[in-house]
Amino acid sequence: MPKQIHEIKDFLLTARRKDARTVKIKKNKDMVKFKVRCSKYLYTLCVSDFEKADKLKQSLPPGLSVQDL
């Protein structure tokens, strides 16, 4: 089941959880979507600023598998 996260801090906390498995990054022409798969939900964060998206991609946990779509 999907859930949307609106704050970057909340997304980073969710990505650092023990049950977080993968992060998928989808790029459109006007926004970047970060999707983290946890055991129960698929959490989505939509970022319209591409510079913030690059910083967020660099600050993801290193043990998490990241896929660019």
UniProtKB/Swiss-Prot annotation:
Top-rank taxon, per record: Eukaryota
Keywords: Ribonucleoprotein, Ribosomal protein
A Gene Ontology BP annotation from the UniProt entry: protein-RNA complex assembly
Gene3D superfamilies cross-referenced by the UniProt entry: 3.30.720.90
InterPro entries from the UniProt entry: Ribosomal_eL38, Ribosomal_eL38_sf
Keyword Ribonucleoprotein: yes
Gene Ontology terms for molecular function: structural constituent of ribosome
Keyword Ribonucleoprotein assigned: yes
GO CC term (a single one): cytosolic large ribosomal subunit
Family label: Belongs to the eukaryotic ribosomal protein eL38 family.
UniProt protein name: Large ribosomal subunit protein eL38
Source organism of the structure: Solanum lycopersicum (Tomato)
